[in-house]
């Protein structure tokens, strides 16, 4: 559900962002956005099928989101064919980066880092490769933007995390972590009652 809402917002916002500047360009932007999303979902799901022999809806939806993120930087600058290529590459970016994070034992249960960080970097660089102003100079500008943005986010994020850690703390107790934060902090003991029963039955085979 979250992925569907996120996809709808990305498609709407990509088209809406150019509406006031050039209404005619809005249709091109929306078409490019949808093409990239479809290509990302198909390539990511297909790659998962090849490696694991089964379909995975979360990987498909993250591929869709990866395609949306990948095209966002240049949705109004691309030909439809370029949008398909960008989206199609975004799928493997999501799949491979998800696998790397899992092997590194970095916790990212919803795949936000592969979708937003890695596909964001790819999409930013793609403007210099496929965009209407594509050139070596433009690619280097895009690369510099990735570096500057990365440094800013790391510095700002570190400061914010350290402030939160000093004032309130970031870790919960082991008991709260074991029970789940929905229960320990939000009194959500009944929110997933049926899901827990179903999940236990599935894993026990009964």
Model-derived segments and their meaning:
Residues 25, 29, 134-151:
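Structural signal for the N-terminal portions of transmembrane helices
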Residues 25-38, 79-90:
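Structural signature of hydrophobic alpha-helical transmembrane segments
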Residues 48-58, 79, 101-108:
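Membrane-helix interface "capping/anchor" motifs
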Residues 54-65, 109-115:
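Cytoplasmic-side transmembrane-helix entry/capping segments in multi-pass membrane proteins
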């Amino acid at each position: 559900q979250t992925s569907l809402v996120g996809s709808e917002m990305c498609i709407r916002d990509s088209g809406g962002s150019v509406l006031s500047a050039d209404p005619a360009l809005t249709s091109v932007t929306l078409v490019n956005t949808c093409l990239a999303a479809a290509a990302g979902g198909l390539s990511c799901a297909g790659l998962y099928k090849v490696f694991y022999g089964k379909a995975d809806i979360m990987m498909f939806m993250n591929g869709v989101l990866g395609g949306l993120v990948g095209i966002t930087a240049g949705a109004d600058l691309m030909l439809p064919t370029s949008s398909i290529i960008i989206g199609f590459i975004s799928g493997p970016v999501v799949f491979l980066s998800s696998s790397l994070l899992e092997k590194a034992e970095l916790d990212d249960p919803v795949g936000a880092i592969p979708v937003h960080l890695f596909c964001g970097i790819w999409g930013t660089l793609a403007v210099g490769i496929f965009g209407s102003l594509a050139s070596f100079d433009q690619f280097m500008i895009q690369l510099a933007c990735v570096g500057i943005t990365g440094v800013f986010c790391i510095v700002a994020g570190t400061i914010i995390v350290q402030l939160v850690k000093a004032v309130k703390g970031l870790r919960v107790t082991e008991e709260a972590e074991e029970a789940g934060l929905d229960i320990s902090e939000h009194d959500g003991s009944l929110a997933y009652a049926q899901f827990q029963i179903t999940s236990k039955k599935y894993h026990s085979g009964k």
